[in-house]
């Protein structure tokens, strides 16, 4: 398994957390939903449609296109989400028409893109003064003893582990990144708490959907090491009926310079 290859993980993605509808409604208002006619949204790196479904609820009258490069992820999205058209494309080459979108977003996926190519592409597809949002649902570890224990065990089992995400550790200055190419300006940072209560099965399934840990575990110690990590997590939660997982939602919203 390679970092960034989600083919084998698509079947587990339904276990992942969503995003708060209240925040997305607010961001969509900033982008002009409700005041503009023919409002169009591009959910880029849409995966199986976790954010796509939220956008459908927040902007039911909008045209939504979900852009996803991975065939397996896109197939799962088509089955699960009916409010959008799923097409093959990437952050660097969406295949969307120029000046066709009012709002573009990447949910927990912008860190996988080459921002020197993706940001100009987003500016190209957005209408004048269009809005781009990069958003993440980062797990909150400081008040979660089980998660802290799991993370510490994983680090001990994979000593060279390097996380590829925009969680709360080792994260980039995304405001600077988003404005670095000159394609976007006035980048605003928004943050809010969020939580979801998961069954043990879903909690474990969410871990099975995490690409960067699984890829590094397999590369470091083979499939057996990844199986050992899953067994360790399962053992940590064996006495729990369900698990309330806390998140910090981190959103970066910027205006196109077009």
Predicted regions and their residues:
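A short, conserved alpha-helix within the catalytic core of class I
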Residues: 113-121
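A short acidic, Gly/Pro-enriched loop at the edge of an enzyme's catalytic core
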Residues: 92-103
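Short catalytic micro-motifs in class I SAM-dependent methyltransferases
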Residues: 107-108
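Class I SAM-dependent methyltransferase SAM/SAH-binding core
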Residues: 42-44, 48-93
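Conserved class I S-adenosyl-L-methionine
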Residues: 1-34
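Conserved Class I S-adenosyl-L-methionine
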Residues: 172-258
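Conserved catalytic/acceptor-binding region of the Class I
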Residues: 123, 127-196
